[in-house]
Amino acid sequence: PSYFDPETKMRGITLDIAKWKRPSPESAPVHAKAAGLYMICTLSKHEAEKKGFQDALMLDYRGYVAEATGANVFFIDGEGTLHTPIPDCFLNGITRRTVIKLAESLQMKVVERHIMPEDMADMNADMNCVELYCEVQ
């Protein structure tokens, strides 16, 4: 099953920027699948949907891009380099690591870095990835 219908996939999903932030590693077990952390994402997704968006982009406690509410985020720049946030306040899960390995196996340069929301304007494509769902927009 797909998270989004075919029309939405072709058009691309819209993301609101969540008002809630991913917490710092000193305040929650950010590298675990912890129920309290899911609440932040669930509330953010519901808020985004009320505003007409399909999902929300989660920023971390410093204002850097972290992830979508249920998916990792990746960006491709004009040179074909894959950029993804450093997983220092969210789970560095299997799907994320697999996407990175696949990109590297295709000889793509992968850069893990802190990404500010305004940096996204310089990217040619973005990708949201969660188990069984990974689409380039």
Where are the language model's segments positioned?
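Helix-start/capping segments and mature chain N-termini
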Residues: 1-137
